[in-house]
Amino acid sequence: MLRGISQLPAVATMSWVLLPVLWLIVQTQAIAIKQTPELTLHEIVCPKKLHILHKREIKNNQTEKHGKEERYEPEVQYQMILNGEEIILSLQKTKHLLGPDYTETLYSPRGEEITTKPENMEHCYYKGNILNEKNSVASISTCDGLRGYFTHHHQRYQIKPLKSTDEKEHAVFTSNQEEQDPANHTCGVKSTDGKQGPIRISRSLKSPEKEDFLRAQKYIDLYLVLDNAFYKNYNENLTLIRSFVFDVMNLLNVIYNTIDVQVALVGMEIWSDGDKIKVVPSASTTFDNFLRWHSSNLGKKIHDHAQLLSGISFNNRRVGLAASNSLCSPSSVAVIEAKKKNNVALVGVMSHELGHVLGMPDVPFNTKCPSGSCVMNQYLSSKFPKDFSTSCRAHFERYLLSQKPKCLLQAPIPTNIMTTPVCGNHLLEVGEDCDCGSPKECTNLCCEALTCKLKPGTDCGGDAPNHTTE
């Protein structure tokens, strides 16, 4: 009896000692699950990685790439319980997320340009869907646990790891953002020179050559420039910036893969020491300044389209401006407001402006798309814009057939294995301004068929109308 009584204070004392420890654990968990005005904690899940037998695994019991073991598998599946229901995230590694010659450019405090080609840039970004749920989408990073975005039964979720592993507790959030008021987010069209008329197509739309062009896999080499305000918004932390930008690129591919277009990031330039142009609240002025800078810096990196992501707010509720029908040309640029650290909202604007570059117009606010939100909607929405409307797909097809932007057919390949350019083969290659075929075939008034250079005195770039998104 005495022993039992004497133990009570010890037990009580131990309980009081444990309470602060438990409270510390709870506090640590609460800090890890940081909610925002846009996101509300939905529940905690524990993903379980399922084993998938790959063809390469059957062959040699390992996944290899150029003789080296690949850290991230080409396909993964994760099972979890969400809302009391078992779901399986079925994910495929995003192809061509980064170009093989991907570079990063920063500037020293003295303004010296420092360009590097980061080593070991094997990425961990995947896209996919909920297994057996047709209209679901997923964009997930598996670098340190599962982090990203997915939809399930038309509800948008974000998932974040509580620990740096993919099979421990993860927080799942739901979005609180409501649909934006159409009156506050309008989209207009501004023509700079007005020289480019409506797209015209020949009557023989369905010739074998054109059918092949439409069916071919298409690629866009994207070059991103981040202004000084963007750099400071991320505390000048390159790791944070890189993670955010790669998340956005993965989401961008989720969207553009629906029209068989792969978007590869071939370069990221950060104006770390100060802006190289005057970045002002007028989107139109900033666009003109960026276009001039871009035209004088074309030799920096081979790319098809460039976007400036700005950390400031533009006037009049505008969030983007792009040159229409301009892919593969020196005027293929856009400026994007990227002040808010919201990857879904940012990719909505980036994908919209890229659509204008590919010949797509705005569509009315009430246009329906399978996911409920169209990429080219004239008003911005908080929903992830997964789809292109039927009319936009038709405009894209007309743009392809009338303009035949050859750079779209070039898959990203390392420059050190590029073949010698051949003028007259209809392919835009390194060192060529244009390639319209042989002198007999060429119908491009701007292109010198014998040299594949633009003719002197021609004004074939910079005259595309601009689309502004507000």
UniProtKB/Swiss-Prot annotation:
UniProt-listed Enzyme Commission number(s): 3.4.24.-
SS bonds (residue pairs): 328-407, 369-374
Residues linked to a glycan: 61, 184, 237, 466
Domain (Peptidase M12B): residue spans on this chain: 218-412
Tissue: Expressed highly in the small intestine and appendix, moderately in lymph node, mucosal lining of the colon, thymus, spleen and very weakly in the bone marrow. Predominantly expressed in dendritic cells (DC) of the germinal center. Weakly expressed in monocyte and highly expressed in macrophage. Absent in immature DC.
Residue ranges the record assigns to the propeptide: 31-205
Residues forming the catalytic site: 353
Keywords: Disulfide bond, Glycoprotein, Hydrolase, Metal-binding, Metalloprotease, Protease, Secreted, Signal, Zinc, Zymogen
EC category: hydrolase
PROSITE patterns: ADAM_MEPRO, DISINTEGRIN_2, ZINC_PROTEASE
Function, in words: May play an important role in the control of the immune response and during pregnancy.
UniProt name for this protein: ADAM DEC1
Gene (name only): ADAMDEC1
